């Protein structure tokens, strides 16, 4: 039986309307056990200022972003279930959901799935990687009962 341990940190000022811990656990359980037996993930919900600072420091981008992924790298020869940390910016997620006409819950779920895949080693730097990652995201989101998060882009093509 797989086990995903969640450490949820609420570092944003306003907690009203945030998904609860059970929802975050469900979203992690929808993606990680497909790839590994045990994992521990920290999800830190932050405001724009912290997201902006981290995005500038680690990615050189001078703006807040929806989700940042920080994979844990164990020292050689040491096996640990720590997968890494997801930093999710509440305001960016809410703004994107509104701009993209997506249900807010579905967009939160997508950010957890997207960030988790980054922790598992997936990326979207080149087109082939992006296609593979987006395909996995879509498959996972559909399996959890949500729409394809990229449906609007596919219709526009």
From Swiss-Prot:
Pfam name, any one: YbeY
Family according to the record: Belongs to the endoribonuclease YbeY family.
UniProt keyword Metal-binding present: yes
Binding positions (Zn(2+)): 114, 118, 124
Broad class of enzyme this protein falls into: hydrolase
Names of the cofactor(s): Zn(2+)
Annotated function: Single strand-specific metallo-endoribonuclease involved in late-stage 70S ribosome quality control and in maturation of the 3' terminus of the 16S rRNA.
Binding note for cofactor: Binds 1 zinc ion.
A single GO molecular function term of this UniProt record: zinc ion binding
CC per GO annotation: cytoplasm
SUPFAM superfamilies referenced in this protein's UniProt entry, alphabetically: Metalloproteases ('zincins'), catalytic domain
Enzyme Commission number: 3.1.-.-
Organism, as annotated: Salmonella paratyphi B (strain ATCC BAA-1250 / SPB7)
GO biological process: rRNA processing
Name the UniProt record assigns to this protein: Endoribonuclease YbeY
Cellular localization per UniProt: Cytoplasm
Keyword annotations: Cytoplasm, Endonuclease, Hydrolase, Metal-binding, Nuclease, Ribosome biogenesis, rRNA processing, Zinc
HAMAP family cross-referenced by the UniProt entry: Endoribonucl_YbeY
């Amino acid at each position: 039986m797989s086990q995903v341990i969640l450490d949820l940190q609420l570092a944003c000022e306003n907690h009203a309307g945030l998904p609860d811990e059970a929802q975050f656990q469900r979203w992690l359980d929808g993606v990680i056990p497909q790839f590994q037996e045990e994992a521990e993930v920290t999800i830190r919900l932050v405001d724009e200022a912290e997201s902006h600072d981290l995005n500038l420091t680690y990615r050189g981008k001078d703006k807040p972003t929806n989700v940042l992924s920080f994979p844990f790298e164990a020292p050689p020869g040491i096996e640990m279930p720590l997968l890494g940390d997801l930093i999710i910016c509440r305001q960016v997620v809410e703004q994107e959901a509104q701009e993209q006409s997506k249900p807010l819950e579905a967009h939160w779920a997508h950010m957890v799935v997207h960030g988790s895949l980054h922790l598992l080693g997936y990326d979207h730097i080149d087109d082939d990687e992006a296609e593979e990652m987006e395909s996995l995201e879509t498959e996972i989101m559909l399996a959890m009962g949500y729409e394809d998060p990229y449906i609007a882009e596919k219709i526009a093509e």
